[in-house]
């Protein structure tokens, strides 16, 4: 079985070893054909607490880690400019 992957933006990093990632899904409306965007928020495991708000990340599906956590952060694609200023 292939693992599911999603690309998204970190919207919250206030929990220990957990981040909330917003993934935007765009699709045409079945009747009107207008592009509709839906945002889904996933809780993902961040083992090193390296992600900050605004970072672009890739998350992969995994076994259940808690009641609401079924995704892990596979890699950080780009850091938020705001997060880079704080760390330096």
Swiss-Prot record:
GO function term, MF aspect, one: rRNA binding
PROSITE patterns for this protein: RIBOSOMAL_S17
CDD domains for this protein: Ribosomal_uS17 (cd00364)
Keywords associated with the record: Ribonucleoprotein, Ribosomal protein, RNA-binding, rRNA-binding
GO biological process: translation
Gene Ontology terms: cellular component: cytosolic small ribosomal subunit
InterPro entries, sorted: NA-bd_OB-fold, Ribosomal_uS17, Ribosomal_uS17_bact/chlr, Ribosomal_uS17_CS
One Pfam family it belongs to: Ribosomal_S17
Role: One of the primary rRNA binding proteins, it binds specifically to the 5'-end of 16S ribosomal RNA.
Record's subunit section: Part of the 30S ribosomal subunit.
Family (UniProt): Belongs to the universal ribosomal protein uS17 family.
Protein name: Small ribosomal subunit protein uS17
């Amino acid at each position: 079985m292939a693992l599911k992957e999603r690309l998204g933006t970190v919207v919250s990093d206030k929990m220990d070893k957990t981040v909330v990632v917003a993934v935007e899904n765009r699709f045409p409306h079945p009747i009107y054909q207008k592009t509709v965007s839906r945002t889904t928020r996933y809780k993902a495991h961040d083992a090193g607490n390296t992600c900050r708000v605004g970072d672009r990340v890739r998350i992969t599906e995994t076994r259940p880690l808690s009641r609401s956590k079924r995704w892990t952060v596979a890699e950080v694609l780009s850091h938020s400019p705001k997060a880079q200023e704080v760390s330096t």
